[in-house]
């Protein structure tokens, strides 16, 4: 995680990198008490709490959310900053789908039945973006009425349903969610200079 932080500071352009913890997040957001109670009572895990946190921060301030485990190897593309919002999504036109399905068939699927079609660890957004605001509202309503999730990927599923059924015209440009996983896919492979080229 320390290496990831350094990469964000190096390649984050002029953005201020803010590292959040349980105390510092209170400086930026007023999280509803029912959410904090569910988190403290372990009815909500930190992964699902971070879904609320990322959307609330983007809704209120705009900017870029990156999970602490994101390793940047180059500067963030300016085109992502120019869009109203951007996140990596499943690309129907990807040529090497089979390779990705073989790598992780639970996450990477191009089946029409699959509702997990976006990556939430990197999200760009302008303040008060319609899609981000609606996703946040959906999550808040869900957690107000539930104590557990039916699927770990609830944010991704809600995004898919929102875009497919209501906000198709607001969908950001589709750039494959395999792209941010390229390095991780070969992380534990034996070093090969040919493969590097």
What is the predicted role of each segment?
Residues 1-50, 68-197:
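Glycosyltransferase-associated regions of secretory-pathway enzymes
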Residues 51-61:
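Small-residue hinge/turn detector
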Residues 61, 66-67:
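Active-site acidic Asp-centered loop
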